[in-house]
Amino acid sequence: MFKETLRECMEGHTLAERKAEQVMDAIMKGEATASQIASLLTVLRFRGETVAEMTGFARAMRRHSIQIEHSFSQVVDTCGTGGDDVGTFNISTATALLVSALGVPVAKHGNRAVSSKSGSADVLEALQIPIQSSPEEATASLQKHNMCFMFAPLYHVAMKHAVAPRKEIGFRTIFNLLGPLTNPARAEHQLIGVYDRNFAEKMAETLRRLGTKHSLLVAGHGGLDELSITGPSTVFEVKGDAIDRYELIPEDVGLERGDLAQIQVSTVQESATLIDQVLIGKANKSAQQIVLLNAGAALYAADRVDSIKAGVALAKEGIASGHVADHVRNLRQTDQEAEQHA
């Protein structure tokens, strides 16, 4: 089946959703060789992935993933595709910490750095915030702290068959787009950062087909996979069965434009230090405002506020009150308590 599929793709044909699901199912079961997987990823990258293919692949990945159980009806994820090559600090992780401090359950789906300076798992460790090592621990953390981190390799075990081919070919593949669409906590409210607006549009349509309550897919100025503080961002808002596209600038939500250099870092520790400063309101203006902007969008996606602007205001209040700093302190104490009992 796989050889036939490769031949069809090489000839320029696209896969129907059901066929794409079967192909990914074969990959997840270890029925495709490393060279076959690499060939498929290469063909798709150069030909361009269709929404039907992305939807079928995502359905299969979701089915093969380990999921966590929880009692929340409005879980949020702030996960991006990565790969923007801009070198910013971990904005989506800072956003997750801020939003969870405001009472919104956040199931952060992420990984270690591959091509970037710092992955979400790396920076959380640098912040001494626990990374849960099992679904049970993740559920307990989500219930107790409104925040858990789901380390992607632990939940997408079947992805092991694609790890070597992805590393060997070395370029972005469809898997970069599928990760944010396969949250193990079944988050139906998402803020997804995408490095390219064309991919953001495809992902929005894919998410609409998969089903979501309210999600924002954002592509920032200069290829940033976050809402940008330095220029306009393109937003695809998916609410139920509808998709709305619009441009957003910082001034629209009461913020000022910032400087890219102020949000760039060279190491994991620099990223962690900047996040710490943001969450106590002591960071440089650009770093402070880009987290407020993205937190405002996440709060809006979570349906906790009626607009991104209102979300920005709520995020500002949370930092100014010291509540966010207290929340981070509680998360750190959990890590220290675990070490004492180890």
Swiss-Prot record:
Enzyme Commission number: 2.4.2.18
Principal EC category: transferase
Pfam families according to UniProt: Glycos_trans_3N, Glycos_transf_3
Known cofactor(s): Mg(2+)
MF-aspect GO terms: anthranilate phosphoribosyltransferase activity; magnesium ion binding
Functional pathway: Amino-acid biosynthesis; L-tryptophan biosynthesis; L-tryptophan from chorismate: step 2/5
Summary of subunit composition and partner proteins: Homodimer.
Family per record: Belongs to the anthranilate phosphoribosyltransferase family.
Name of the protein in its database record: Anthranilate phosphoribosyltransferase
